[in-house]
């Protein structure tokens, strides 16, 4: 039985972007979970990423899950200038913004949660502010990965604690949880490529990964 081709009106990503900061000190931090997401996807899809000066980032291309070409990008411009790299790729390949899927961290989502949307505001995220400014629209899909909020936050130390939380690294226990979350990210992206963002939204926006997952029943 042949697989049914996606309908023409479905939103299918062509460029998948992960947001983060390029210096080694930011590796594996909560704010760089977008970079980690792209690295995970590239590893599973066997796509080689290399620095591309024209695109101001690490860039790779492959064919997944069918014969269609897919582009992966990690902007190396620092977070608040991410849009420069994104627009460079979009302009070069003449891609509409609706084909750009951006993966990034979200404090308003608890750890263990994903949230796919077709469009929306930056929500205070500097990388997304830059992306929206350079693409000239909010009408492009995004995948937010929950990193949770810092505990015991106070009005006096709120901003400092927030920055420390965002730029801090996951604990060993949190890393185990995020490994499972990243597997979910790959699944959601692959479904988006096959059946569109809307289908992935319906299946993954209500999924929660817990620290002590219940064993799946036999299929």
Swiss-Prot record:
NCBIfam families: pth. TRNA binds at residues 26, 78, 80, 126. The keyword Protein biosynthesis does not apply. Belongs to the PTH family. PANTHER family: PEPTIDYL-TRNA HYDROLASE. It catalyses: an N-acyl-L-alpha-aminoacyl-tRNA + H2O = an N-acyl-L-amino acid + a tRNA + H(+). Keywords: Cytoplasm, Hydrolase, RNA-binding, tRNA-binding. GO terms for biological process: protein quality control for misfolded or incompletely synthesized proteins; rescue of stalled ribosome. The active site is at 31 (proton acceptor). The record marks 105 as: Stabilizes the basic form of H active site to accept a proton. Hydrolyzes ribosome-free peptidyl-tRNAs (with 1 or more amino acids incorporated), which drop off the ribosome during protein synthesis, or as a result of ribosome stalling. Catalyzes the release of premature peptidyl moieties from peptidyl-tRNA molecules trapped in stalled 50S ribosomal subunits, and thus maintains levels of free tRNAs and 50S ribosomes. CDD domains: PTH. This is Peptidyl-tRNA hydrolase. Its EC number is 3.1.1.29. It is found in: Cytoplasm. GO terms for cellular component: cytoplasm. The keyword Methyltransferase does not apply. Its main location: cytoplasm. GO terms for molecular function: peptidyl-tRNA hydrolase activity; tRNA binding. Monomer. The record marks 21 as: Discriminates between blocked and unblocked aminoacyl-tRNA.
């Amino acid at each position: 039985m042949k697989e049914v081709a996606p309908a023409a009106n479905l939103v299918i990503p062509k460029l998948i972007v992960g947001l983060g900061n390029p210096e080694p000190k930011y590796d594996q931090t909560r704010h760089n979970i977008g970079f980690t997401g792209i690295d995970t996807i590239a590893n599973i899809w066997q796509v080689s990423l290399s620095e591309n000066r024209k695109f101001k980032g690490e860039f790779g291309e492959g064919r997944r899950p069918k014969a269609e070409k897919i582009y992966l990008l990690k902007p190396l411009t620092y977070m608040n200038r991410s849009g420069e790299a994104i627009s460079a790729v979009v302009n070069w390949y003449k891609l509409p913004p609706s084909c750009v899927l951006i993966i990034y961290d979200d404090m308003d989502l608890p750890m263990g949660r994903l949230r796919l949307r077709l469009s929306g505001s930056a929500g205070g995220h500097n990388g997304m502010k830059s992306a929206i400014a350079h693409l000239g629209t909010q009408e492009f899909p995004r995948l937010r990965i929950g990193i949770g909020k810092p505990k015991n936050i106070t009005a006096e130390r709120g901003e400092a604690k927030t920055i420390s939380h965002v730029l801090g690294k996951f604990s060993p226990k949190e890393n185990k949880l995020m490994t499972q979350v990243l597997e979910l990210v790959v699944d959601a992206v692959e479904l988006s490529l096959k059946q569109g963002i809307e289908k992935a939204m319906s299946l993954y926006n209500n999924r929660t990964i817990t620290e002590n997952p219940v064993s799946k029943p036999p299929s």
